[in-house]
């Protein structure tokens, strides 16, 4: 009888998945040192205090904007200056990039005190001078073209591939803006660049989408999406030609992702209460390959594509508001498989923004989620539970001025894949990820090389000798 039961137990061990009750994420929210309930929106990742380390920026809607830096095992707010913290202007969108070509990123805070149309307070463009944060829009010469229209997301665009970034502002109920330095003055160039359309602007991404220049995809509400092809620094909307207008849907979270691991970027696009899209370029037309359960409608906010568990396959995190979050893994041949969630499910969470970064430099990404809108909640922070033998490679491209080369494309080439990632210029929805290409390494992967396509379309290849490191590469 004892032998009989032993056989049954052995059989059950074989047939029951060992990871049946395993959590993908672990909750590390406790490392946030001061984490009260608040109304938060967009999240970005940049080096706020120019100390060489990346920090999370969390916007506040009637609450302080935060700069969370990892110090002594804790995430601590390191900025309490009025121009940055700015609790009265109701910030929702944020992105960082180097507009003045000094090698450090300025921070664009998009403020919105009304749902649509004309707003009371303009946006801020924050620059660190010495130890003081200043708003470049408060300088008299820069006040000609202030944005006084309600908006949502912002994205950084190096339209000429010369390291001179501009900021695309997705406005709601008013024309799109595109801010850039011209003769040492910040001006709106949206009209001359063919970008000044009026729509319900929501999410926006920029990168090597359909050309070797930096193109723009904008997911809109109550109107068609835009797909701007960059031709000699000006833009032509080709959304209809490429079949991504999606006029019956209301766009939200958007990210660039190499869905087929073929060495090019495609588009993940979530729609509010509508079908989510996985647009893959085939024969000069984007085909939506999304299937259930990935495409099932939800109250989507942020979409993030990243390798959380360092297995060499990207996950897709869907941050929903007022309903549970979802997680998927992109397998070979465009198969998108759902991963059960318990930790980070947040079925009662009012998620409004999210971003990823390896904030503690241990080779595993952290996921920071902000909450708010109709219900004040604290921030939450998660990271994947991973096997100790998993390896990673992180690639940090810097442009010729020494700033993050946002919009550049990094491709890992090996015996198993050709896997592209964008150096994030702004994505998700209201948000922006760390400007590093983070790769987990697959089992039996070898002969690894890295290719960088800079924002000017030129490419360079590099051999990789050692893993478990961050490689910093400066543009020549």
Model-based region annotation:
Residues 9-19:
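Bacterial N-terminal signal peptides
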């Amino acid at each position: 009888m004892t032998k009989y039961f032993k056989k049954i137990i052995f059989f059950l061990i074989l047939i029951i998945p060992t990871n049946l009750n395993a959590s993908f994420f672990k909750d590390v929210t406790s490392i946030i040192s001061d984490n009260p309930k608040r109304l938060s929106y967009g999240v970005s990742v940049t080096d706020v205090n120019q100390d060489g380390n990346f920090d999370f920026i969390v916007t506040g809607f009637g609450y302080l904007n935060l700069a969370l830096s990892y110090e002594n095992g804790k995430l601590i707010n390191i900025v309490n200056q009025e121009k940055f913290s700015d609790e009265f202007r109701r910030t929702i969108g944020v992105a960082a990039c180097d507009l003045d070509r000094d090698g450090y990123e300025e921070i664009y805070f998009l403020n919105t005190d009304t749902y649509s149309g004309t707003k009371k307070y303009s946006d801020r463009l924050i620059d660190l001078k010495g130890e003081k944060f200043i708003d470049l829009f408060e300088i008299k010469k820069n006040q000609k073209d202030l944005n006084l229209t309600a908006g949502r997301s912002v994205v950084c665009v190096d339209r000429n591939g010369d390291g001179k970034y501009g900021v695309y502002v997705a406005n709601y109920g008013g024309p799109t803006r595109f801010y850039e330095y011209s003769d040492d003055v910040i001006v709106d160039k949206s009209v001359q660049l063919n970008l000044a359309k009026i729509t319900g602007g929501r999410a926006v991404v920029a990168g090597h989408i359909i050309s070797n220049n930096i193109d723009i995809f904008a997911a809109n509400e109550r109107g068609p999406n835009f797909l701007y092809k960059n031709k000699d620094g000006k833009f032509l909307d080709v959304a209809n030609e490429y079949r991504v207008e999606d006029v019956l849907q209301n766009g939200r979270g958007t990210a660039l992702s190499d869905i087929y691991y073929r060495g090019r970027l495609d588009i993940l696009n979530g729609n509010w209460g509508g079908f989510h899209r996985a647009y893959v370029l085939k024969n000069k037309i984007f085909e939506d390959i999304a299937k259930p359960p990935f495409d099932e409608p939800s109250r989507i906010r942020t979409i993030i594509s990243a390798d959380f568990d360092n297995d060499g396959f990207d996950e897709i995190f869907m941050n929903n508001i007022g309903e549970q979050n979802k997680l998927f893994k992109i397998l070979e041949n465009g198969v998108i498989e759902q991963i059960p969630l318990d930790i980070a499910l947040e079925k009662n969470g009012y998620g409004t923004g999210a971003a990823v970064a390896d904030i503690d430099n241990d080779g595993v990404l952290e996921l920071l989620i902000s909450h708010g809108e109709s219900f004040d909640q604290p921030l939450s922070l998660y990271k994947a539970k991973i096997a100790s033998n998993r390896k990673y490679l992180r690639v940090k491209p810097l442009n010729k001025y020494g700033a993050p080369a946002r919009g550049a494309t990094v491709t890992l080439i090996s015996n198993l894949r050709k896997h592209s990632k964008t150096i994030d210029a702004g994505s998700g929805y209201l948000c922006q990820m760390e400007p590093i290409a983070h790769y987990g390494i697959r089992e039996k992967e070898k002969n690894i090389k890295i290719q960088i396509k800079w924002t000017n379309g030129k490419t360079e290849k590099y051999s990789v000798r050692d893993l478990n490191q961050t490689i910093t590469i400066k543009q020549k």
